[in-house]
């Protein structure tokens, strides 16, 4: 732990916080629109950076590099194949959300089905954030920072105690940032962190390969390409962690849900000043996802050659960073990892507050004819963020005892919440006659079936394939239920809150992105460098 790395870490982190504070100081957050949607005033560059950094947390740095170290590059499919889903979201989903004036995903479901469906989905979202998203983000950040710095080594605490302390440091910092600054402050810091992430992506291959080759960059690069090449393969076989076939089943569904229906992601897209800026922002985030294998995953590949048998494989990323990078770059990497963790944590907190205040608390006040003021709603939202933060910080350290790998644990648990929501939204998009009863029964059917087949019964089927099968069965279930309840025709109500003209030249850019997606899979295969 060098003084230079700590000083650079503190200076970079302080600069980002100060810059965000200066940019937002003249705009006090006094309305729910300002707290949750940055007053719909973000341009495409801010939207793209916010989308990318809300997606990239310490979970990816820790989880994906662990998977590459223990298995191979097949885990990159989560990010690279998501480009197709993101483009579909930009083309079809975003226009619907902007056109209907929906501020939350449950808000749209309330318009499409009914208010009880809106409440049910809001509760499922909140459970997902409190149980899965927020604790996992804190744990991933704690593992990364503990491995890189181990600030509290002089206290001679155990690894478990270190994790507890770092979880609370990240959680308290993130909570304060979200409560005081709102979505605008989060979006600005994300944009700066995107630049830092790109810098790391350029610098790490240089320093990592140079260290691997004992000072000779080309020798290190040759070692990476000629030894343990099985780890370079992104085309997963049946026994790999991510088989290739899952890209076309459960993974595609989860990616489409994540980028088009996950509240804390969609909320970033809806903060744009127009539909065109939102679509451009999504396209910019796609470019970032294509660069991620070169930015995020190189440490795992280098770690394969440096460490033959790690006891805690989740530590491979921080160990590689600590051993290969110079002090200033360690500080920058730590600042970006901390910033990414705080960014995703903040986005989840902000969305949790949005869901609670707009979909549960405000309707409860209206039902009782109580006075509602923007000031009171903002105050309630901030209090709720503090409560959710505390719950996440108390539960995060226990992820260490998960039997599955960290990233697999994260995706398995996430599937239980996201795919049923995806199903009822997709059916709502496609069919205008499916009633609210079908949506509620479909959600309950999916969640209980997934718990039984994935956690209670020992079904020898990859969880992503199981998610795809349950998606099909739940869709059939909803259509069957629809036959026994009175049908009604849903009529979309159009609310033009921002400029709705789409991005004119998007198809050329979309085509280039899809070509890039295929090229990266070919590169990391037996036809390429694997």
Where are these regions (language model features)?
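Membrane-embedded helix-loop-helix hairpins and adjacent transmembrane boundary segments
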Residues: 1-530
